[in-house]
Regions:
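Bacterial Sec-dependent N-terminal signal peptides
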Residues: 1-22
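Active-site-proximal segments of metallohydrolase catalytic domains
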Residues: 217-293
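Beta-strand-enriched, solvent-exposed domains that form extended recognition/catalytic surfaces
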Residues: 27-152
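Solvent-exposed loop/turn segments at secondary-structure junctions
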Residues: 185-188, 226-230, 284-288, 304-306, ...
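Fold-level signature of zinc-dependent metallopeptidase catalytic domains
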Residues: 153-211, 222-232
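Short pre-active-site segment immediately N-terminal to the catalytic Zn-binding motif
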Residues: 191-194, 289-313
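Active-site recognition of the HExxH zinc-binding catalytic motif
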Residues: 76, 307-324
Length: 426
């Protein structure tokens, strides 16, 4: 009887565990960049392959090739043509997916560039790009093609000669989070300022937990991407600058929303750098920024709230954290399907009384938790978040993902950041 029971346990364990993908079996040391174009409206979208570029060494994880996170609005996955195995996946969001929630997307079709990096396979692979369906909350295939690493049309030309500075090196990239800062709106004469700004941003990052305790898990790089003119576009003030990333305020007609709409330009800027995460420092005193998961983070260089905005936007772009505020103006409409759980680790729709961080809540904490200052510092379920005052909930009374006044991240966001760092480092 004991032998029979042990056999059953072993069988169940085998089916419950995912086989680890051997990096060296399927991939070489290089990185490929897929330049894509996403086009459509709020109701439909299509993806087109523009070009493939051979870049430097792959700097991402080599131990968890299939991402453990069900994050983002899109997933890119690689399947071996030889044996059918799923050998790589990662997820991301995009400015295009945000635009599809605006009023404009109901009136006109638009196209946005989107570049995705993958490890270079040794043999042919099937590339499957999936979208998260609003109706179900699940991923569904959107675009597929076969990639042959021996294809002579894969570009190998140098796209720029921007200098890459090593700011902090704590070890091999495959065991670290490689964060690259890129200059936007800095002329050649302003590169000394950019280097000082990078050092300041690095100080901001490691001044707050959990990054402060995890500094040894990061490598930091800086790309001296030179612009012809200083600053950035401010369209509603009729200010236009010739800059390397073509960034601008007034994205989706929101004054503070600072982005670089042409994602391909940003990808080209950092083509010679190792990176897991990209952060663009924009040379301006005007308040604004943006952060999009596994896409980029971007914000102003010289404002009294530069530190707070940087840490907030990096929370979006690196850890997939959602916005916990609900009172500021945004252009989005119907961002979340309230019948399903949001993918962001710090938001919940509380359907059926379920929520992601239940294990972190004290049994004496009332659920839902009243929005009262006496519950500050308590992990709970507070109504209001994700741009909506009703039916979307956040885990804390205040947090860096809610306001610039919060002293730091709440325990739920801290846990999510730590898990993302672990993914890249372990």
């Amino acid at each position: 009887m004991k032998k029979y029971f042990l056999t059953i346990v072993l069988i169940l364990a085998a089916f419950g565990c995912k086989a680890q993908i051997s990096y060296n079996q399927y991939f070489n040391n290089d990185r490929l960049r897929l330049d894509l174009v996403f086009a459509g409206t709020n109701k439909q979208q299509r993806v087109y392959l523009e070009s493939i570029h051979h870049e430097g060494a792959w700097s991402g994880t080599r131990s968890q090739m299939v991402s453990p996170f069900d994050y983002g609005n899109y997933e890119v996955a690689l399947y071996s043509v030889a044996d059918g195995a799923k050998i790589y996946s990662n997820s991301f969001c995009s400015l295009f997916s945000e635009w599809r929630t605006t009023q404009e997307s109901k009136e006109v079709a638009k196209a946005f560039t989107n570049s995705v990096v993958i490890p270079c396979p040794k043999e042919k692979v099937k590339v499957v790009l999936s979208e998260r369906l609003f109706e179900t909350g699940k991923m569904s295939p959107l675009f597929t093609f076969t990639l042959d690493p021996e294809d002579k049309e894969i570009k190998r030309d140098s796209e720029n000669d921007f200098k890459v500075d090593e700011i902090l090196n704590n070890g091999p990239s495959e065991h670290k989070v490689d964060l690259v800062f890129a200059a936007e709106g800095y002329t050649a004469e302003e590169m000394d300022k950019f280097r000082r700004d990078v050092q300041r941003f690095v100080g901001y990052l490691f001044d707050i937990e959990p990054y402060k305790s995890r500094k040894a898990d990061f490598n930091i790089w800086a790309v001296e991407s030179v612009s012809v003119e200083s600053g950035t576009d401010i369209p509603h003030n009729d200010i236009w600058k010739n800059t390397v990333a073509a960034s601008n305020f007034y994205t989706f007609k929101i004054d503070r929303y600072l982005t670089a709409p042409d994602h391909k330009k940003v990808a080209q800027m950092v083509t010679n750098a190792p990176y897991d995460a990209i952060y663009v420092i924009v040379n301006t005193e005007k308040y604004g920024g943006g952060g999009i998961y596994n896409y980029y983070g971007l914000s102003m260089s010289d404002h009294p709230y530069t530190k707070e905005v940087f840490v907030h936007e990096f929370g979006h772009s690196f850890a997939g954290l959602g916005d916990e505020y609900y009172e500021s103006d945004v252009a989005y409409e119907d961002t979340y399907n309230l019948n399903y759980e949001p993918w962001e680790p710090n938001l919940t729709t509380f359907v059926g009384g379920e929520y992601k961080w239940k294990g972190m809540v004290n049994a004496k904490t009332p659920i839902p938790t009243p929005n009262e200052a006496k519950y500050a510092g308590v992990v709970g379920v507070f109504e209001g978040g994700g741009y909506s005052a009703k039916r979307i909930y956040r885990p804390s009374f205040d947090c860096r993902m809610k306001t610039n006044k919060a002293p730091g991240f709440c325990p739920v966001c801290t846990d999510a950041i730590n898990r993302m760092i672990d993914y890249y480092c372990r």
